[in-house]
């Protein structure tokens, strides 16, 4: 989210207030609490208004330092949250020095300047990682006319759009980068691997594989200087990687709270170990999933004879194959999803799956969370209330992707149990894996 108009000014319609001073600093056994003001307070009269930010620094795991920033605390805490494995029993070392207050977690250290200026610095041992100074931490107010124009543009799109968000307050942090430092990460991305110079938005979209949009956004970046930053928000986090200010990575979130973690390590592998220790690690999938998967691809015209031609061709070329994947057209066109094989192409799917298994293959099929009007499942879903509805109680439908398609309402327990039953039918038939496509823009 670019707010600046060059280095000296901000864009019209935005009021930006930067933290200028750690006015009050309190320490406990496990955290540092800072009352941060937007100017250096020189007399009592300057304490009559804000905005102030209350910043809490803590560490619940070795070599991980958490920064939590609040403006207003009276809002509703109703956003989805990431599950984190913090150790409530872990205590960092905290001490006050002449010109700073220091937190030490393992070999990772944070220093916060005291006095009439704002500065934070993160180190791993004696090695500087990153930090903030003047014009780093800020609160941003968006003018109503900017908000109204933003909302109007979203209302004009009746389905595939970001959430319509009327909030006009944003919190932003800007952390320094050094000469030659490279930034990586942010989840699945199709833009250049080195992210310097890019604007990176954390919002899952069905945007294909050749734009800045992506399907699996993760608000974590990794630096070539062996540190990482994770923004703990499932909201629409916007990163500017040396693209708004060329020597900083900035991240902005809508609302009154911003929380992020800094991970220190001796190398990139150690940083990733700390990140996954906090956020979790996936279970190890079956061994065959690491092998080669062969797909029908999207619009290929295929039947059982065609797929055996593909599979036999791999064997003739001595290319080992573990999984064969059927994309959308295993079902009849205009009927996705109906969870039924196209009988014109696959008259005996159970026998076909058995033959594929006899060749030592696992089988995967494609699905999505939509039900076309011509699907045999549409009437059942409508009658039982399994679909997302309009405000008037009618089924929401559109013609994007499949004509007249409805969207399964997975907030309805009866709907997802129904959907589970449809999946079980496939598994009982001999399908081993499911490609769960779409759903990003709902």
Region spans (language model):
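A low-complexity, Ser/Thr/Gly/Pro-enriched, surface-exposed linker/loop concept
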Residues: 2-43, 47-99
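Catalytic and substrate-binding clefts that recognize carbohydrates or anionic sugar/phosphate headgroups
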Residues: 1-4, 15, 38-39, 47-49, ...
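Aromatic-lined carbohydrate-binding/catalytic grooves of carbohydrate-active enzymes
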Residues: 283-442
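A residue-level signal for beta-strand positions that form part of recognition/binding surfaces
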Residues: 31, 226, 289
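Short amphipathic alpha-helical segments with coiled-coil-like heptad repeat character
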Residues: 65-66, 228, 427-429
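Generic domain-boundary/flexible-linker signal
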Residues: 68, 78, 231, 240, ...
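Alpha-helix boundary/capping detector
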Residues: 74-75, 83, 246-247, 301, ...
């Amino acid at each position: 989210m670019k707010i600046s108009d060059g280095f000296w000014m901000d864009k019209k319609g935005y009021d930006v207030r930067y933290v200028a001073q750690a006015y009050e600093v309190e320490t406990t056994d496990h955290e540092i609490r800072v009352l941060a003001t937007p100017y250096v307070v020189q007399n009592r009269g300057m304490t009559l208004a804000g905005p102030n930010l209350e910043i809490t620094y803590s560490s619940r795991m070795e070599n991980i330092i958490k920064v939590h920033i609040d403006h207003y605390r009276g809002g509703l805490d109703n956003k989805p949250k990431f599950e984190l494995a913090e150790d409530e029993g872990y205590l960092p070392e905290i001490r006050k020095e002449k010109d700073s207050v220091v937190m030490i977690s393992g070999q990772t250290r944070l220093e916060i300047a005291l006095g009439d200026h704002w500065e934070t610095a993160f180190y791993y041992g004696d090695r500087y990682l990153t930090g903030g100074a003047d014009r780093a931490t800020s609160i941003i107010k968006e003018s109503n006319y900017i908000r109204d124009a933003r909302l109007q543009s979203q209302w004009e799109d009746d389905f595939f759009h970001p959430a319509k968000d009327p909030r006009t307050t944003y919190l932003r942090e800007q952390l320094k980068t050094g000469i030659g430092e490279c930034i990586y990460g942010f989840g699945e991305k199709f833009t250049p691997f080195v992210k310097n110079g890019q604007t990176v938005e954390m919002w899952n979209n069905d945007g294909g594989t050749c734009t800045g949009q992506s399907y699996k956004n993760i608000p974590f970046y990794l630096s070539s200087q062996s540190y990482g930053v994770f923004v703990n928000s499932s909201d629409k986090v916007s990163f500017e990687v040396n693209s708004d200010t060329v020597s900083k990575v900035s991240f902005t979130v809508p609302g009154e709270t911003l929380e992020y973690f800094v991970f220190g390590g001796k190398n990139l592998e150690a940083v990733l170990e700390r990140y996954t220790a906090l956020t979790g690690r996936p279970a190890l999938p079956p061994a065959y999933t690491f092998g080669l998967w062969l797909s029908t691809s999207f619009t290929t015209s295929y039947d059982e004879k065609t797929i055996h031609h593909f599979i036999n061709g791999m064997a003739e070329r001595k290319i080992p194959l573990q999984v064969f994947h059927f994309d959308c057209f295993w079902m009849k066109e205009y009927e996705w999803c109906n969870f039924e094989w196209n009988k014109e192409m696959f008259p005996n799917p159970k026998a076909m799956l058995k033959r594929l298994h006899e060749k030592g293959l696992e089988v995967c099929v494609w699905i999505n969370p939509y039900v076309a009007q011509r699907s045999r499942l549409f009437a059942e879903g409508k009658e039982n209330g399994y679909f997302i509805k309009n405000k008037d109680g009618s089924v929401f439908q559109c013609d994007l992707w499949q004509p007249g398609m409805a969207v399964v309402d997975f907030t309805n327990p009866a709907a997802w149990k129904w959907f589970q039953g449809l999946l079980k039918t496939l598994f009982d038939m001999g399908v081993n894996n499911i490609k769960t496509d779409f759903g990003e823009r709902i």
